[in-house]
């Protein structure tokens, strides 16, 4: 038998095509009807057993309702490793037992999650039980509040958090995370020893958006310690330390890049706009913009840049350069005992700054500014 040339070529090409094709993906068994039904379930957890029950059953629920959950002392409300697409709803008042420990009180991780609060809810840390004026620097060991770690393509919105013992949100190892319309009210701590009650601490994360936050606290409203593509808008920050980059340096990740603060108000706070890099460390801060920022009754510094954070009496060091720093329409008031602007840069380590329509008044003019780059004034 003789095959014609066309047929031989066709067979050869077909064989080659089969050999060159990648192996098909492994086929896994589809979920059973029972598994699908479980994942479609709305699960409600409440009372003193609610936290442990939620932790045990969390992967069996597509919607988790936490209704008046009383988390036992020394226990984390563990919502880590949730199924993709899980919706968590805080309802009623969530409370926490007292114990000296480091926390966190709540921990969440997963992908495509939605974390919301029902109308009238509150997450009450009752921080006065720990407050002693020391914060994380000593005294009682205080639990951090909310670990938003290893979150991807997720949204946390509409939560009302009251009286955290110390830091509120720790955002770490997260990408494409949105925090929207969050209220943090630690105002009781103003006269009762609240300290280091940072609202949003961000590290080693990318594409984090915080919008519409209302914060009353006693430390940074936002502190970006490392990360890229961070956006904060429409914020109201009262009583704390302002909108901060850093402190940067001395960590495993010391790069801050492409951070924008826009359309926000800072009132009755120690600082307004703040960049702080730790003395004798390395890293970089670049592409940071503050636009349309209003300052009111700032107590210490309206705008402050320090490359000697940790030892401000020493000469600023150059290991963490600050480049492409933009201020656009930053204006407002400092109290008479405060300082309008302080810039403490190392030699040549602050460059490519662009300040436009910057007006901060009411306080003193600093005589301690060093190595102020062109494009800025002190």
UniProtKB/Swiss-Prot annotation:
Keywords linked to the UniProt accession: Cell wall biogenesis/degradation, Cleavage on pair of basic residues, Disulfide bond, Glycoprotein, Glycosidase, Hydrolase, Repeat, Secreted, Signal, Zymogen
Entry EC no(s): 3.2.1.15
UniProt signal peptide: 1-20
Predominant location category: secreted
UniProt-annotated catalytic positions: 219, 241
Disulfide links within the chain: 43-61, 221-237, 345-350, 369-378
Protein family according to the UniProt entry: Belongs to the glycosyl hydrolase 28 family.
Known function: Involved in maceration and soft-rotting of plant tissue. Hydrolyzes the 1,4-alpha glycosidic bonds of de-esterified pectate in the smooth region of the plant cell wall.
GO molecular function terms noted in the UniProt entry: polygalacturonase activity
GO biological process terms, semicolon-separated: cell wall organization; pectin catabolic process
Organism: Aspergillus aculeatus
PANTHER family documented for this protein: POLYGALACTURONASE
Pfam families per record: Glyco_hydro_28
Catalytic activity: (1,4-alpha-D-galacturonosyl)n+m + H2O = (1,4-alpha-D-galacturonosyl)n + (1,4-alpha-D-galacturonosyl)m
Propeptide residue intervals: 21-39
Subcellular localization: Secreted
Name of protein: Endopolygalacturonase I
GO cellular component term of the entry, any: extracellular region
Top-level taxon in the UniProt lineage: Eukaryota
Positions of glycan attachment: 44, 46, 48, 52-53, 55, 57, 62-63, 73, 258
């Amino acid at each position: 038998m003789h095959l014609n040339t066309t047929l031989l070529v066709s067979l050869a090409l077909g064989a080659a095509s089969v050999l060159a094709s990648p192996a098909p993906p492994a086929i896994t068994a589809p979920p059973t009807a029972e598994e699908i039904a479980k994942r479609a379930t709305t699960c409600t957890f409440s009372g003193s057993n609610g936290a442990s029950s939620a932790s045990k059953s969390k992967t069996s629920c597509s919607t988790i309702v936490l209704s008046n959950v009383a988390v036992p002392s020394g226990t984390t409300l563990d919502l880590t490793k949730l199924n993709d697409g899980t919706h968590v709803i805080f309802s009623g008042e969530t409370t926490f037992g007292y114990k000296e420990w480091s926390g966190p009180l709540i921990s969440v991780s997963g992908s495509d999650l939605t974390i919301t609060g029902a109308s009238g809810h509150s997450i009450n840390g009752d921080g006065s039980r720990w407050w002693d004026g020391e914060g994380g620097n000593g005294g009682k060991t205080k639990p951090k509040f909310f670990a938003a770690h290893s979150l991807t393509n997720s949204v946390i919105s509409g939560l009302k958090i009251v009286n955290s013992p110390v830091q509120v949100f720790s955002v770490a190892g997260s990408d494409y995370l949105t925090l929207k319309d969050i209220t943090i009210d630690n105002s009781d701590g103003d006269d009762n020893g609240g300290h280091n009650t940072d609202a949003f601490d961000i590290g080693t994360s990318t594409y984090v958006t915080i919008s519409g936050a209302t914060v009353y606290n006693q430390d940074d409203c936002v502190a970006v310690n490392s990360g890229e593509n961070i956006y904060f808008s429409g914020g109201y920050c009262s009583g704390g330390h302002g909108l901060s980059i850093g402190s940067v340096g001395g960590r495993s990740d010391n790069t801050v890049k492409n951070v924008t603060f826009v359309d926000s108000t800072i009132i009755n706070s120690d600082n307004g706009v703040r960049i702080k890099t730790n003395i004798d460390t390395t890293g970089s801060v670049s592409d940071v913009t503050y636009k349309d920022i209003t300052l009111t009754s700032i107590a210490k510094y309206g705008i402050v840049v320090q490359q000697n954070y940790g030892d401000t009496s020493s000469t600023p060091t150059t290991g963490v350069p600050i480049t492409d720093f933009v201020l656009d329409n930053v204006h407002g008031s400092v109290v008479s005992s405060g300082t309008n602007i302080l810039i403490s840069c190392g030699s040549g380590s602050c460059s490519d700054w662009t300040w436009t329509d910057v007006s901060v008044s009411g306080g003193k003019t600093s005589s301690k500014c060093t190595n102020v780059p062109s494009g800025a004034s002190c």
